[in-house]
Amino acid sequence: MAEHNGGGNPSARQTAAEAWHDYWKWDRVRWGTHRVNCYPGSCPFRVYAKDGRVIREEIACNIPQIIDPEYRAPDYNPRGCQKGYQHSRAMYGAERLLYPMKRKGERGSGSWERITWDQAFDEIGAKLADIIQSHGPQSIIIDQGTNGAGVLRGGGEGAGAGLATQLGGVSLDLNFSIGDFLPGQYLTFGQFQQCPGVENWFLADTVLVYGNPVYACISDYHYVLEARYRGSKVVQISPDKSPSAQFADMWLPVNWSSDPALWLGLCRILIDKGWIDFEFIKEQTDLPVLVRKDDGRFLREADLKEGGDAEQFYVIDAATGKLEALAKGTLQMECDRVLEGTVEVRLKDGTRVEAVTVFTLLRKRVAEYTPERVYEIAGVHPDQLEKLAEWCRPPRRIFFFSAAFPGKMYHGDLCERGACYVLALTGNVGKAGTGSHGWSAGAEFNAGSGFVGSMPPEILESDDPIGGALNTTQKLQEAYKTMFAMDPTMPVLEAAQGMLREGMKTTGTLSPPALFWYYHAGYKDVWDKHLEDPNAPRKISAYVEEAVANGWLQGYDMLAKEGSNPKALFVSGGNPLRRTRGGMNTYVRTVWPKLDLIVVMDPRWSTTALHADYALPAASFYEYADTKFSCPNTRFSNFTDESVPMRGESKSDRQIIHGILRATTAELKKRGIKSYTAGPREIDVDKIMWRATYGNKYGDSNADEERLVDDAYRALGEVGWFTSLDGEKLDLANLRKNGGSWLSGRPTFPAMVAQNADMVAGEVFWCFRDQVEQKVPYVTTTRRIEFYLDHPWFIEADEHLVRYKQPPYIGGHQPMRLTSGHLRWSIHSNWVTAEEMLKLHRGEPFAFINSAVASGRGIADHDYIRVFNDYGNFMVRAKLTECVRPDQLVIYHAWEPYQYPNWMPYDGLLPGPVKGLHFAGGYRHYQYMLWNWSPAQEDRHTSIDIEKAAFQG
């Protein structure tokens, strides 16, 4: 055999061997992770560098094993995916933004000039001073994304939040910008941010799967596969045979938006056969609670006597047949409750009405959904439905993986509520191997500039402003119970939510993006025109106007007020021209001409950056020390160290924002402006930088910022929110030693309080233990799991109980429906143009189309097709498959618009209407707060048609 690279020459062979060995040598190795929203992420890496350049990374299996004394589960290691494995190449890719850039030509023309940081800061500061002086600070809009979300030095909810806090601008709530709110769980439990550990999936006997976790949860899905080895059944519910369906024991190919019929048919079988947990539903749910027959509202004490409590509800005492007040401060039952029954009551005006239990109404509702009708509506055969009921029969443990799509589908709330019905009826809440999940993060953000920078002066003047801010949250919760609500029976979570809600109102810096879209981005007319819902009693505009008029968004409605006039847009860690439905259609055409200033901070050239006035290079993940947000799903907080210096002239997001703040304050002072009004606040110009630097304690140098990380984690450890992996003191040195820390205990940030359970390092974790074990109430109107929604809007729409509703027509009456999901080769648009990822697929956007349909329309594999509806159109490559429905087109999200012909992505034909009911307010848990309860754009099942395109590429 011939010798490779040198034939028979020994010296040549030695040179090749030496070169190969030299390739695997490095100068330094550091801990690393990737601060993107690949939730839950938490993937630890070792990063290898040589000659000032990162040469590779590999998964570090340093997450301690689960050693729960009661529940055995596989450990987390290894955690990682192909996106993380190639970042060492992507950070040197052609799309990397390395220098401050200023637009020369028209926006989006591609004409740029390189400028210095001083010029960028001075020009942006002068323009911001103009805007503050002429239009007010609330005309500055901050769009925070999730990429680059370093807790203390990164973008998005990290340092990015400080820009709104200090200048008085308006930050758009990122959870509704990206559409990851889960309305069905929120309506049922009063919260959606409960996040059991991913190891909890392994303990389930039946796993109900929405979405496509094989693509979206690469690091976690092994728990589902391992659960099958112990006999668990996996049920995939999706209209197409997704990649996740091949690993399921049962695939239910449901018709469009027909999931509520499936769940109600399942509930019917469970109830008729007595396969429900009677004690659980009596104690934990509203099923025994009485509802007035005349108006469909809960029976309240205020109905029965003058001055009665409007939040005191009733059940029927099974022993006496009389009314019994439902306890507020505990779930402990004061008597045995009647589940199915009717009682006549005398109202305060002397009239008599009948009241009926919610369970009675539920039985009537589910009776409509016979197996035959479910088959007709949903396409699920009666035999499958019966088998599913057997797999959900108590005492089997059921876990519901909802993914993130319910918040992106018009009737996704009904779909999700239906699944929650099944969980509650069978008692599958608050126990190991049961429940559902949302997403949760944020314990570390209480050490960030958005929170600490808003603290009272005495805290910022102290020696430990971060520790002072963290300790303040607990005091504020107790104060909210007494001073604000005057209700000592209030659950801790409700107090935490109230504290955050009222606190953020006082800053005037947060708004639901729906108000921005509706009042300023052109969607008011688009939504009313391109949404046709035969079951909706009103147009979207009617819901918006009533909600605003009723003051349901008071304190967050600055963008709905007369005179509101956005003039500047800052984008940190986001990409709104890609992410917003209709982004390259209505959004850019309407918003861009209104803006005097558009600034994007990003490590790469995104579509939004290419349409900005200034593109500022943010440092990448391996270039400075910080951590990624932690979450209860893994309880592991990853640390990323500086493996190499920041590339080019890039800076941390915190350094960029401080440069902008410093230049803006200098310009304001030059003009003699000492203070200005920002909503409810008065901004002292002299104090802007003082607050941003926590009382001038942390400057902008790398050493200063590392000291900030050090002090923040020391403080987080001292309050017990995080613990080190080795039991030693938590600080930067410990993070550098171990690569991370444990999220633990009960952090008082509301998204953490929502777990309703202690987080113990190394133990299996599940949520709602407080409710099941300690009888702590839920944070709903009745303080129980709510099957019934008695808000007038939901009663009017006949959604007080779950029901099937046909999907609306979005975009027209075309014969096909468009669906989407998370792309396998990127995290949102991060890495979507990375060379290594492009090698793993066709290298450009493509859409899955049914092979038979394509053949009938003369479309071959890889042809360009034109996809269109009444709102817009785009072109994309066709990828033929038998795995999608004949009336379906599947295109995964996150391709950059500039990867499509004419820069028009699939979002260009998505009018993205919101569901008007989600503007409901005025009740205990129908109140907006950060990340919770607001409409998001709905895009799943948009109406489309296709044809072969003449475009050749």
Label the predicted regions.
Residues 2-13, 653-711, 715-725, 829, ...:
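Long, contiguous, secondary-structure-rich segments that constitute the structural scaffold
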Residues 143-151, 373-380, 403-411, 442-443, ...:
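Conserved short loop/turn motifs at secondary-structure junctions
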Residues 243, 607-640:
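Flexible glycine/proline-rich, aromatic-decorated loop/lid segments
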Residues 155-235, 338-346, 358-364, 376, ...:
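Extended redox/cofactor-interaction regions of prokaryotic respiratory oxidoreductases
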Residues 120-141, 197-204, 364-366, 386-399, ...:
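Glycine-rich phosphate/diphosphate-binding loops that line cofactor/substrate pockets in enzymes
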Residues 1-341, 372, 458-505, 512, ...:
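N-terminal export/assembly segments and adjacent metallocofactor-ligating motifs
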Residues 94-119, 123, 268, 273-382, ...:
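N-terminal leader/propeptide and maturation segments of large enzyme subunits in energy/redox metabolism
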Residues 248-254, 622-623, 636-647:
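Short beta-alpha connecting loops at secondary-structure transitions
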